[in-house]
Curated annotation (Swiss-Prot):
It is found in: Secreted; Target cell membrane. It comes from the Eukaryota. GO terms for cellular component: extracellular region; membrane; other organism cell membrane. GO terms for biological process: defense response to Gram-negative bacterium; defense response to Gram-positive bacterium; hemolysis in another organism. Disulfide bonds join 51-57. Residues 21-47 form a propeptide. The keyword Signal applies. This is Oxyopinin-4a. Keywords: Antibiotic, Antimicrobial, Cytolysis, Disulfide bond, Hemolysis, Membrane, Secreted, Signal, Target cell membrane, Target membrane, Toxin. GO terms for molecular function: toxin activity. Residues 1-20 form the signal peptide. It comes from Oxyopes takobius (Lynx spider). Expressed by the venom gland.
Amino acid sequence: MKISQVFIFVFLLMISVAWANEAYEEESNYLSERFDADVEEITPEFRGIRCPKSWKCKAFKQRVLKRLLAMLRQHAF
């Protein structure tokens, strides 16, 4: 009898893990689409960043945002 209870527990655990992984992938895809849509709306003034003219702030901002988004996607935020 104990073997069947363990089997049922493992079976239900596998189903719940598979369901959680599927929901997680859908959510991460949605978030990455939102990040892509919102990137162009962010300006240095909006974020409170004041860049010296020698930094070429626009290019710097884009590099920082690309790195940030890549890190967030890797860690599946």
